[in-house]
Amino acid sequence: SDVYKRQMLIYANVIMKQLSQGRYQLLRKDDAGKGRSQQGLELDVFDQESGNIRSIKTLSGGESFKAALSLALGLSRMVQDYAGGIELNTLFIDEGFGSLDSQSLDQAMNCLMELHHENKLIGIISHVSDLKDRIERQLVVERKQKQSVIQMI
């Protein structure tokens, strides 16, 4: 419903503000077409730097990853608040980090480390080599001959 979408955006924007250093705010598109908005959550983004509202589709790969992460974490928080004690303590991220520059990678990892310190289990599936030094416990999957070998580091 509309109330849930608004609440999720409030939570998502707290995270988006952190990840974008205050540059971006996610906004619901105006209900100009009435009826379209009930099919899903159509978003724009307010760019604090330019002062303009633009389509979320214009975000770069790294910015899109930050928006997606913000929305996922915002949805998780909203479900926990509204579902009477249900806790979502696990998050898996499959790739996505490859589009981030080093500063954005730092911001994303800091956000995920905060979740880790809140006793959340964060699983990251990635080929980004910069992550190897940042992640304490790793499962490394390598192809050897005709099979995959898993190693705990």
Say what each PLM segment does.
Residues 1-153:
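Terminal ABC-like ATPase head and other globular end-domains that cap long coiled-coil arms
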